[in-house]
Amino acid sequence: MYTIGQVAAMFQLPISTLRYYDKEGLFPYLKRKAGIRWFSEQELEALRVIECLKKAGLEIRNIKQFMQWCTQGASTYPQRYELFVRQRDAVEAEIRHLQRTLDMIRYKCWYYENAMADGNEERVKTLTPAEMPQEIR
């Protein structure tokens, strides 16, 4: 069993975040003794899932719904599946967007590296895509 401070340190989260998750009902089996929250391995696993889902872009209300579905057993598999399909699609779209951003940044790095080597932008400005390295086009 772990105190809220220990869990906060383990997950590098503010204590206030753990209190908020508790208030939102994300730790339904959390034990309290003399006003102290005691986190078991079950809560630690729930927290791992919560943090993963947050990083994937799920809002707390959706995470809460997912956690409730998990307690309801196999009958909620279709809902859980749909939740993850939607989130997968959203994450894949974000990855595509970030890839385009990274491509532009790589191009600008290449562009200014060449401009610095030449002492100006004149040559690099007039290059056609066919004259650029494959990874920059």
Task: Label the model's feature ranges.
Residues 75-137:
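C-terminal regulatory/oligomerization modules of transcriptional regulators
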Residues 12, 41, 47, 73, ...:
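Helix-centric, low-specificity signal for extended rod-like, repetitive segments
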Residues 1-68:
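Basic helix-turn-helix/winged-helix DNA-binding cores
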Residues 8, 26-27, 44-45, 72-75, ...:
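A generic structural signal for solvent-exposed, polar alpha-helical segments
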Residues 55-82, 86-87:
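Amphipathic alpha-helical dimerization/coiled-coil segments
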